[in-house]
Amino acid sequence: MTIDRKSLINWVGGKRLLRKVIEPLVPTDIKSYIEPFGGGAWVLFYKEKWADLEVYNDLDGRLVNLFRIVKYHPNAFKEEIKYLLGSREMFLQFLNGTFITDIQKAVQFYFLITRSYGGRGETFVPAPTSRP
């Protein structure tokens, strides 16, 4: 069933605009759906379920970690981002900081890409560019 969920991030080169074109090209009787260039996961989130086995992958391990944490530890992730302020000082702390746990790394990555110009995590923008 198509539910058209939205990704929690925007990603350069994402397939957000192509998902309605891609969906009819995928056979309905597949046993596994593998997303090798996952990016913002727009195609994966477009349907409630593509197959019994769904695999998200991307060359950028920070993306993989972010979506793994959101899937398996959503409450911890929400709790961590609930009180984040969009200040330049905090952006610089996140940009230059060292984060130990996978949850901390996911929050760091999410904060940087949602509060940076073009979602690249390099230049601070005062307002978030996407919302969870």
Sequence positions of predicted segments:
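S-adenosyl-L-methionine
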Residues: M1-G38, W42-V43, K49
